[in-house]
């Protein structure tokens, strides 16, 4: 008998089906997606670090050059004409009739103390808006015509605030907490 006749006949692809094939790994199929995600995350982190460092530098420079106006609406006004009322305390920066310079050491401006509200000051502008706008200012002024400024002693006095501000000015680095505490 011929041996070719008894040879088993297999389909052509049958051998390929029997050979073991490995499924590709997750990393090999998604390699480019993972690499792009890593690059994007690194870029985002670099941008955030740059933004926060520049904000910190700007805040430190602003405090150093006194571009930030600290909340003290009395610091630019002369207090020579104002007599102290009994039972009230004067804010930091106020002078007595005999003193020529404010307590803070800043030179006094030529702006006299009047019943007119201070303009171009964001703190007093917000206070005027909160108390009823410009119409409320004349009513408040007519209620106490002889007392242009009345101060109330609170737990956080102006002298404590000024000492905190002076401490901040003497330091080289500042944090958000420092800026919040100074205001």
Curated annotation (Swiss-Prot):
Comp. bias (Low complexity): 130-143
UniProt subcellular location: Virion membrane; Host cytoplasm, Host cytoskeleton; Host endoplasmic reticulum membrane
Annotated transmembrane regions: 32-52
GO biological process, one term: microtubule-dependent intracellular transport of viral material towards nucleus
Superkingdom, natural source: Viruses
Membrane topology classification: Single-pass membrane protein
Cellular component GO terms held in the UniProt record: host cell; host cell endoplasmic reticulum membrane; host cytoskeleton; membrane; viral envelope; virion membrane
Compositional bias (Polar residues): 111-122
Keyword Membrane annotated: yes
Sequence segments annotated as region (Disordered): 81-157
Pfam family name, one: ASFV_J13L
Keywords in alphabetical order: Apoptosis, Cytoplasmic inwards viral transport, Host cytoplasm, Host cytoskeleton, Host endoplasmic reticulum, Host membrane, Host-virus interaction, Late protein, Membrane, Microtubular inwards viral transport, Transmembrane, Transmembrane helix, Viral envelope protein, Virion, Virus entry into host cell
Interaction with host DYNLL1: annotated span: 149-161
Subunit note: Interacts with the host light chain cytoplasmic dynein DYNLL1; this interaction is critical for intracellular microtubule-dependent virus transport toward viral factories.
Function according to Swiss-Prot or TrEMBL: Inner envelope protein involved, through its interaction with host dynein, in the intracellular microtubule-dependent transport of viral capsid toward viral factories. Seems to induce caspase-3 activation and apoptosis. Plays a role in virion morphogenesis by recruiting and transforming the host ER membranes into the precursors of the viral envelope. Involved in virus attachment to the host cell.
Family to which this protein belongs: Belongs to the asfivirus envelope protein p54 family.
Protein name: Inner membrane protein p54
Annotated organism of origin: African swine fever virus (isolate Pig/Portugal/Lis 60/1960)
């Amino acid at each position: 008998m011929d041996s070719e006749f008894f040879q088993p006949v297999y389909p052509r692809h049958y051998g390929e089906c029997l050979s073991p094939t490995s499924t590709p790994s997750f990393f090999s199929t998604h390699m480019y997606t993972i690499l792009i995600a890593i690059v994007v995350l690194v870029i985002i982190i670099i941008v955030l670090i740059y933004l926060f460092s520049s904000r910190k530098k700007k805040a430190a420079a602003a405090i150093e050059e006194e571009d930030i106006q600290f909340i003290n609406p009395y610091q630019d006004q002369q207090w020579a004409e104002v007599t102290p009322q009994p039972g009230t305390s004067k804010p930091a920066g106020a002078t007595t009739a005999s003193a020529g310079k404010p307590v803070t050491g800043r030179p006094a401006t030529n702006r006299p103390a009047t019943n007119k509200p201070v303009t171009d000051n964001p703190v007093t502008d917000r206070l005027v808006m909160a108390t009823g706008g410009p119409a409320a200012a004349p009513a408040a002024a007519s209620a106490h015509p002889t007392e242009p400024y009345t101060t109330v002693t609170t737990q956080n006095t102006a002298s404590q605030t000024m000492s905190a501000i002076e401490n901040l000015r003497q330091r080289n680095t500042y944090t958000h907490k420092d800026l919040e505490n100074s205001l």
